UniProtKB/Swiss-Prot annotation:
MF annotations from Gene Ontology: microtubule binding
Pfam families cross-referenced by the UniProt entry: Beta-prop_EML (PF23409), Beta-prop_EML_2 (PF23414), HELP (PF03451)
Biased composition (Basic and acidic residues): 23-53
Protein name in UniProt: Ciliary WD repeat-containing protein ctxp80
Disordered as annotated region, ranges: 1-53
Organism: Euplotoides octocarinatus (Freshwater ciliate)
Keywords: Repeat, WD repeat
Family statement drawn from the similarity comment of this UniProt entry: Belongs to the WD repeat EMAP family.
């Protein structure tokens, strides 16, 4: 395999490519179709899915859309819950001061693999750097501890006005590691995207770089070998390529790359070169920063290989580029000219590629990581990982791989595989329940239920939500997942006071009962009364009953002994978003999508119209209702009832934690009355859908919907 010139024309414009005959694998086409397609967003007032443009310039309200009838001034005028707000007989003295507590981000469970690539690397110390949500993560895989770029205490503001001068405030979408493994670069989405360069060992910020308005997101980013420049590609209509001086923070060059999306980019490793290559949809090109004009030079295929899309690219020390083709082949380039191709993957597409120690290491749709010698195009080592490979890196005989299923895998020189990170990986993740002081359970739209060990910071069990494909009886949860509604779960509950069962609410309306956290894979009962998907569930304090809140507007009550249905609570005019049991198990209060706060007597399953007054002396086993006298001050100024997604009280009753649409976890004094100030914590990039104190309030747990990330906040 030589590196001679292409037999194609020397002028790129003279090569006419018929893209209808290009060799692009069908599954790669499907991925790109999904990336550009309209997505479903959840209207939190109607509870229905609505279509939105997936590449909206600003995603402030992307996945939770407020309906006109229930938001803004109309909401403020109507407030249907207001008549149910009564001051409780016993409460703490109100204070507007922020609570005198500090919660630090200790650990996050997440890795963005759904739509990103080449985003997981070794740093100089051998630790693994990657990203999830709005965080850059440095994982010490031996100690299982993490450091972060971003995250921590922040102002209680919308993302539209949140400060983005110090860290990311929205989804990180692209990453690179410098060739010397000391710097990381990350870029985020938003109407005016920003990117950062930060220390790969400590997470300390080194520089910030702002793109033009309308950039939508950073799709690719790369640090040059000398650590002088960072190249950044936007997802605007022209897919502009920017070059910034890392130390000065100034823009050096900018040019339009064309109409097609750029997936990845890399700088030449050859001494003296200042050349960057871009790989994308129907696109391979090089850009020479040292040339008289900074202009794109399209790849020339000639007769050396079939045109295709390219998902990733790397360079060797001699100045040859290697791109991962959408047809399973690796393309070898000298400058803009294709010199040869070789195929070691055989099928699918090449999803990741890296030049390490004189070899090409690549990963593909075929679920294989392959070390190959580009000189002869032969595979020297093949490792089967059984999943689409999104990212590969190699250092000191070890390989780290990011997989599409949300797993980060480390492989030693003997081929031994170790999962160093597991995460939810498709659609959204909503389900979160605390089982005991060290154990919690999560579920998502990826057909996964996880049991987690908080103290040891790892997953202890994983089970499928369902093994059959079933659609919803009516309606349906909004999601980008490719899994059937039966395989998606938005709600989990643990019977802490009783038999230890775990209930999982599916998006097709069914509820499955699992034996417990140690037998999460064993379904002992299936409940099918609900007509739509399940958003909330709770066991009674003594564990004798299970309440299931459905999007068919009803609450179903079951005996936890045999899960026979005891009754149905019917009074709400919209889907159920939260429910709480009284400590004695005699009352249930619930909130729905129409902002109603209602009370029911469990004995006769009837609504108590005077429930607010009749329960002023009542203590509540849980406090998830976002409307009430004790939580009247939790809504940010100018927002409506849809902006708070979950509420929990600490076991001592002194603190309140809320999850909001701005990606914030907020800690308040109890009560949180008008004018109260929270301690606000940022780390999530999208709407936080659930948050809980652990027993003794030593930790706060939170889960982000679209970012699919679980965060563990430790009290200092």
């Amino acid at each position: 395999m030589g590196c001679g010139g292409s037999s194609g024309a020397s002028d790129p414009s003279s090569e006419k490519i018929n893209w209808n005959n290009a060799e692009i694998h069908d599954e790669f086409k499907q991925e790109q179709k999904k990336a550009g397609a309209k997505r479903k967003a959840f209207d939190k007032t109607t509870g229905k899915a609505v279509e939105k443009e997936r590449t909206a310039a600003d995603r402030e309200f992307d996945f939770f859309e407020g309906a006109d009838a229930g938001s803004g001034e109309q909401f403020m005028a109507v407030r249907p819950y207001e008549g149910a707000i009564v001051e409780p007989a016993q409460h703490n003295e109100p204070s507007k001061d922020a609570p005198d507590v500090t919660y630090d981000l200790e650990y996050v469970y997440g890795y963005r693999a759904e739509d990103s690539r080449m985003n997981c690397f070794y740093n100089k110390n051998g630790n693994v750097c990657y990203f999830t949500a709005a965080l850059g993560v440095v994982l010490d895989q031996d100690k299982n501890t993490q450091k972060f770029f971003g995250g921590g205490q922040t102002d209680n503001t919308s993302k539209m006005v949140a400060r983005d001068d110090m860290y990311h405030t929205n989804d990180i979408t692209a990453m690179d590691m410098s060739n010397c493994r000391t710097l990381c670069a990350t870029g985020q989405n938003g109407s005016v995207p920003v990117a950062f360069v930060w220390d790969a060992a400590t997470g300390a910020k080194k520089g910030r770089y702002k793109l033009d308005k309308g950039g939508r997101e950073v799709t690719a980013i790369a640090i040059d070998p000398k650590k002088k420049y960072v190249a950044i590609c936007a997802n605007d209509n022209d897919h502009q390529l920017y070059i910034f001086d890392i130390d000065k923070g100034t823009q050096v060059k900018k040019d339009k790359s064309g109409p097609d999306r750029i997936f990845h980019m890399a700088w030449s490793l050859k001494d003296g070169d200042s050349v960057v290559a871009t790989a994308g949809e129907k696109h391979f090109a090089i850009w020479n920063l040292g040339a008289d004009s900074f202009k794109k030079k399209k790849g020339i295929y000639g007769d050396k290989g079939k045109p295709t899309s390219h998902s990733c690219v790397c360079w060797d020390d001699a100045g040859n580029a290697y791109s991962g083709g959408a047809n399973s082949s690796i393309y070898v380039w000298s400058g803009q000219n294709l010199t040869s191709t070789y195929d070691v993957h055989g099928k699918g597409f090449v999803g990741a590629i890296r030049w390490c120690d004189g070899k090409i290491i690549s990963g593909g749709k075929d679920g294989q990581i392959i070390i190959s010698n580009p000189a002869d195009g032969k595979a020297e080592k093949t490792i089967d990982v059984g999943e689409l490979v999104r990212s590969v890196d190699m250092k000191g005989g070890k390989i780290v791989a990011g997989l599409r299923n949300g797993t980060i895998l480390e492989i030693d020189s003997k081929g031994t595989k170790k999962e160093i990170m597991k995460s939810h990986s498709d659609g959204e993740a909503w389900g979160l329940a605390v089982a005991d002081k060290d154990t919690f359970v999560t579920s998502g739209d990826d057909n996964k239920i996880y049991v987690w060990d908080l103290k040891n910071r790892k997953s202890t069990a994983l089970a499928e939500i369902c093994n059959e494909d079933k659609n919803s009886k009516a309606g349906g949860a909004s999601s980008l997942t490719e899994y059937a509604p039966s395989k998606c779960g938005r709600s989990v509950a643990v019977n802490v006071g009783g038999n230890g069962n775990v209930a999982v609410g599916h998006n097709d309306g069914r509820v499955t009962i699992r034996g417990g956290v140690k037998s999460i894979d064993k379904v002992t009962k299936t409940l099918t009364d609900s007509g739509e998907w399940i958003e909330c569930m709770a066991y009674s304090p003594d564990g004798s009953m299970l309440a299931v809140g459905s999007h068919d507007n009803n609450i179903y009550i079951y005996s936890s002994a045999d899960y026979s249905k005891l009754g149905t609570l019917k009074a709400h005019n919209s889907f159920i978003v939260s429910l709480d049991w009284s400590s004695d198990g005699t009352y249930i209060r619930s909130v729905c999508g129409a902002h109603e706060l209602l009370f029911f007597t469990v004995e006769d399953f009837k609504q108590d119209p005077s429930g607010a007054t009749n329960t002023v002396e009542t203590t509540w086993h849980t406090n998830s209702a976002k409307y009430g006298w004790l939580v009247s001050g939790i809504f940010p100024a100018g927002t409506d009832g849809t902006h708070i997604n979950h509420v929990d009280f600490s076991s001592s009753g002194s603190l309140i934690v809320t999850a909001d649409d701005y990606g914030l976890v907020n800690v308040w004094r109890n009560p949180a009355r008008a004018g109260a100030t929270p301690v606000s914590l940022r780390g999530h990039s999208e709407h936080v859908v659930r948050t809980y104190f652990t027993q003794g309030e030593s930790y706060i747990l939170s889960i982000g919907g679209y970012d699919k990330t679980i965060m563990q906040w430790k009290k200092k």
